[in-house]
Each structure stands twice: as structure tokens, then as C-alpha cells.
């Protein structure tokens, strides 16, 4: 009987040394494995494979939940897509070619449901669709850097090395604007004294074209003037007649190497205005020469205005920096000029949005932006949720 019990015991529990098969097992116990009556080495390894697969699935679950959470947040908080004629142009636009600017079929809903906003499309020509993207977002101000060629053409680019003969001030900006204003001013709603502007929701809003003179200003000046003259002839430009300022649907501002003496020169039909230095407005020697008869903007580099911005945990400007901004903006307001700060921090997103909010709360004249969609259509307070950046560069 004792022998029978022994055989029975050895049958039910046999000790076998098994070498690990799966890499994760190498970190486990190397001692001999014990199998059940109904288990051998093959079935044990299969069981281990299943448990490992289940483990991998379980590890993927938190990642899937996170992705689903972010996707839902973006879907719920993101602004709805636009359906205006301008947005249609953005979706179908093509680069200028040897035939000139991209030509589009006019639609009466060109700016339908677009609310104009005091935002400036910084370095607009870098966008996938210059001009139209900014207008579709509702930004009323657009920037173009121009370079003069030997044959008196105005090329648009941030640097001379990246210029191309097809991308000119005419093909990217002047010809498209001509097309828009011609179609906007064919009805009885517009008269010789009052031309209709860009936006249906506020046709009295003037669109601003900021032209950054990159080469010698005195050489550029007559060429820029001649290309803008057709706009003046059609009464589309804001101008100063020597006594009063008459607003048109398009306002031209010169910056960079724009010569202030030439801006001042035409005292009876001035239609290019100056981008005044914001930090000089409080100066007793220079401040008095800039006003609404010769200038439109008063701009400065953000760092030059308030010093370095440290992206610390609060993502906010110091109280001293806020006070400085408020006094600078007031100095511009007192002269009737629109303040503008360029080179604001693009990142971290929370810092960027707080700087934007601080500037708007202080009454900045024009918000200089690179990210059009975030600036014009998102609720800035929802751009970062639970540490997740839902809106960024667009």
C-alpha cells in the first residue's frame, strides 16, 4: 500500500527543470517548475504566452484611454470649420505662376460669418496661403516684406536668398486685394465717398497692409508708391488730405526701412503711413513728431519693451512688466496710434496665451500673431487642459 501511494504521489507531482522561453521570463525565477497533472512543458509555455499578451494589452489600455480623452477634448473644444468664400479660396489656392496671381471665382459669401479681429498676421507670406488665411481667420492686418530688384519689381520674402520671381507684392497681395475690392464695390451700397470694406459683418473696417521695406527705403519708395496708386485712384486707400484723415477699406503702413521723411513729404495726399517706434513716444525729442496724420502703428520688440520673459511655472508676466506694458500702450493711445508688440513668446503655449491675454487686457491696439487659428478662433483658456496643449501652431 505504501508503494502504491508513493507511485500515486510521483505521478501527480513531478519536478522538471525548464529553461525560460520568453525574454521577460529571464528576469524571473530560474528554479525548477512544478506542473499539474494535466500540464506539460508545451501547455505551460502556451499559458505563459497568453498571459504575456494579456499583459501587453493591459499596458496599452491607459495609452488608448489617454488618446481617446485628448481626441474628445479637441473635438469638443475646437472651433467649427469656416464655410466662407475666403475659406473656399484657402482650400483651393495655388501658388502664383508666370501668369500672375491665383484667380478665383467670386462668391457673394466671401466673408460671411467672419468677425473682424484686431490681430496682425506676422510674416504672412510664410503661410501656406498668404493673405487669404489671415482674412478667413478675421485678422484685419497683414504683413509683407518687400525687396527691390534691378528691374524695379517688388519681391516678397523674409530674406533675399528665398525670393522667387513669381512671389511679388502684386501677385500675393495687390492683385488679390484688387479683385476683392472690385467685387465688393459694384453695388449701390458703395459710393464714390464711401467704399465697402472686406468684411460683411463690419464693412467699415479697414484692412491694414503692413509693408516692411527690406532694401534701401529711398529706392523702394517710388516703386511702392506707383504700385499703390491704382488703389488711391479708386478711392480704396486711407489718406490724409492736409486737414483730416479719411479712412478707406485699405490702410497702408510702412515699416522696416520706410523713410519717415518721405512719408512726411506729401502733406496733401498722404496714403502711406509710418510704423512709429513705440518706445520713443514718451521721449521729449521724438515723441511729438508721430501722430495720426503720419503714423498708424506704434510698434516694438517685446523683449526690448519689458525685458526677458521667464517661462516659470505660473507662465505670467511680472507685475512690473505689466505696468510697463500698460504705460506704453497708453502713450500710443494718447497719440491716436495702435500699439503692437512683435516677437512675443510662441512657447510654452500657456505662457503665449497669458501674454496675449495680458496685452488684450491692457488694450493693445493690434495683437501680433503667428498662430492664426489659436489666436482668432480658440478660447485661449482652453488651449491647455490638464497639461495637454490642445491648440498650437497652425
Summary of predicted features, one role per range:
Residues 2-116, 151-394:
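Catalytic cores of phosphodiester-bond hydrolases, prominently lipid phosphodiesterases
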Residues 128:
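Glycine-rich phosphate-binding loop at the start of an alpha helix
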Residues 135-136, 360:
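Non-catalytic positions within long, well-ordered alpha-helices that form the structural scaffold/packing
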Residues 148:
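Short, glycine/acidic-enriched loop or turn micro-motifs at the edges of active sites
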Amino acid at each position: 500500500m505504501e508503494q502504491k501511494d508513493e507511485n500515486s504521489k510521483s505521478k501527480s507531482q513531478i519536478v522538471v527543470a525548464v529553461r525560460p522561453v520568453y525574454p521577460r521570463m529571464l528576469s524571473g525565477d530560474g528554479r525548477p517548475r512544478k506542473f499539474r497533472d494535466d500540464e506539460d512543458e508545451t501547455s505551460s509555455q502556451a499559458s505563459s504566452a497568453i498571459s504575456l499578451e494579456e499583459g501587453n494589452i493591459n499596458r496599452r489600455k491607459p495609452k488608448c484611454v489617454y488618446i481617446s480623452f485628448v481626441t474628445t477634448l479637441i473635438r469638443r473644444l475646437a472651433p467649427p470649420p469656416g464655410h466662407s468664400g475666403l475659406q473656399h479660396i484657402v482650400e483651393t489656392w495655388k501658388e502664383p505662376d508666370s501668369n500672375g496671381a491665383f484667380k478665383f471665382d467670386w462668391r457673394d459669401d466671401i466673408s460671411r460669418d467672419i468677425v473682424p479681429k484686431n490681430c496682425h498676421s506676422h510674416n504672412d507670406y510664410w503661410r501656406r496661403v498668404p493673405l487669404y488665411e489671415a482674412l478667413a481667420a478675421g485678422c484685419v492686418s497683414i504683413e509683407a516684406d518687400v525687396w527691390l530688384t534691378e528691374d524695379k519689381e517688388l519681391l516678397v520674402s523674409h530674406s533675399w536668398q528665398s525670393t522667387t520671381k513669381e512671389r511679388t507684392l502684386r501677385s500675393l497681395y495687390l492683385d488679390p486685394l484688387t479683385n476683392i475690392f472690385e467685387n465688393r464695390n459694384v453695388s449701390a451700397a458703395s459710393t464714390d465717398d464711401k467704399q465697402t470694406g472686406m468684411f460683411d459683418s463690419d464693412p467699415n473696417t479697414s484692412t491694414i497692409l503692413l509693408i516692411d521695406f527690406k532694401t534701401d527705403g529711398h529706392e523702394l519708395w517710388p516703386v511702392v508708391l506707383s504700385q499703390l496708386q491704382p488703389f488711391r485712384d479708386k478711392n480704396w486707400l486711407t489718406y490724409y488730405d492736409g486737414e483730416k484723415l479719411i479712412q478707406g477699406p485699405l490702410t497702408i503702413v510702412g515699416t522696416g526701412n520706410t523713410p519717415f521723411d518721405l512719408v512726411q513729404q506729401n502733406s496733401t495726399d498722404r496714403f502711406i503711413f509710418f510704423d512709429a517706434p513705440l518706445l520713443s513716444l514718451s521721449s521729449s525729442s521724438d515723441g511729438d513728431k508721430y501722430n495720426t496724420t503720419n503714423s498708424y502703428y506704434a510698434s516694438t520688440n517685446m523683449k526690448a519693451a519689458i525685458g526677458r520673459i521667464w517661462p516659470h511655472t505660473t507662465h505670467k508676466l511680472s507685475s512690473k512688466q505689466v505696468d510697463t506694458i500698460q504705460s506704453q500702450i497708453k502713450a500710443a493711445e494718447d497719440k491716436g496710434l495702435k500699439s503692437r508688440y512683435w516677437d512675443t513668446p510662441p512657447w510654452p503655449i500657456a505662457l503665449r496665451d497669458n501674454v496675449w491675454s495680458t496685452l488684450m487686457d491692457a488694450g493693445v491696439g493690434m495683437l501680433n500673431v503667428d498662430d492664426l487659428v489659436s489666436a482668432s478662433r480658440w478660447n485661449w483658456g482652453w488651449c491647455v487642459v490638464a497639461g495637454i496643449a490642445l491648440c498650437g501652431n497652425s
